[in-house]
A protein has these predicted regions:
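Extended catalytic cores of very large enzyme megasubunits
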Residues: 1-143
Length: 143
């Protein structure tokens, strides 16, 4: 006798019946590295979020590895200044808005995560909802 390791209810059954529709998962986490490029970089997280949202899944985007706002780094002769996690939060918000309004409504969501013990936590918390209307925010608290 064989048993199915997948519970055939809700989203999973819907996907098994029609694998062209929504993904059978509700939410996955993408930990963003402090780099624009690379498989776990900022740009890769945009592709990840876009794919999840277009297929009806949600995603959690963990922004705690990004450099704090105002941090200076050198690239050759140039001095680059980090814009911080909230600035990237605006991009995820717009991405979600555009994908939800463009064509068929999908039931995906984006939750931005940020660690409480980091320098930009207060800005992350206090940014008005009107500036990040299409994402939810979560502060990670540790002992």
């Amino acid at each position: 006798m064989t048993t199915s390791l997948i519970s055939r209810t809700g989203r999973v059954q819907s996907w098994l019946d029609n694998p062209e529709s929504r993904l059978p998962v509700s939410c996955t986490v993408f930990v963003v590295e402090d780099s624009m490029e690379g498989p776990n970089g900022i740009e890769a997280s945009w592709r990840f979020a876009s794919h999840a949202l277009r297929n009806g899944a949600g995603c959690a985007i963990h922004l705690s590895k990004l450099r704090p706002k105002g941090t200076e780094t050198r690239k050759g002769d140039d001095v680059l200044v980090a814009s911080g996690p909230v600035s990237f939060g605006r991009i995820y918000s717009v991405l979600n808005e555009v994908l939800r309004r463009g064509g068929t409504y999908r039931n995906g969501a984006i939750v931005l995560h940020y660690d409480l013990n980091l320098p930009d936590a207060l800005e992350f918390i206090q940014t008005p909802r009107s500036e990040l209307p299409w994402v939810k925010r979560c502060i990670n608290i540790t002992d």
